[in-house]
Amino acid sequence: MLLSCVCARLQEPFRLHIIANSDGAADQNVKLLVRDAILEYTADEASACRDKEQAEHYMREHLSELEACANQVLAENGFSYTASATLGRFPFPDRTYGGITYPAGQYDALRLVLGEGEGQNWWCVMFPPLCIV
């Protein structure tokens, strides 16, 4: 267990956080479609990043494209609201991926808020690429 904590600290994570418009079934479903589109869009680059800074730089350089990607999914599925993409430091609960535990705390992330952003959220660790593998 100690090794898990040490490994997590050695590779400071960068996260993806998507917040649905509401808890309604349609809003929750489109949140997952946005997730799939964003993970597909970033898969090659995110898995090639050597460190958190490189992953964050990629997200910063492509922030408008990532927001457009989310908005395209929303429009294609008949939603009138849009997505807002931001980079920042946000609170997250603890999470274990295999043998690596990331404790609860503030982490750097790409956050996509869909519409009002009042629904259940989905998140993962993009670097190291744990939600891509």
What label would you give each PLM region?
Residues A8-F14, G98-Y102:
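Secretory/periplasmic and organellar redox-cofactor proteins
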Residues D23-G24, F90-F92, L130-I132:
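Solvent-exposed loop/turn segments at secondary-structure junctions
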Residues M1-C7:
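Hydrophobic membrane-insertion alpha-helices, especially the h-region
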Residues E56-N121, V125:
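Mid-length scaffold segments of soluble, non-membrane domains
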Residues E12-L63:
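Early exported N-terminus immediately downstream of N-terminal targeting peptides
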Residues L33-R35, S47, I100-A104, A109, ...:
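General N-terminal targeting signals
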Residues I19-N21, G115, F127:
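Solvent-exposed residues in well-ordered beta-strands and their adjoining turns
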Residues W123-V133:
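Flexible, solvent-exposed short loops/turns enriched in glycine
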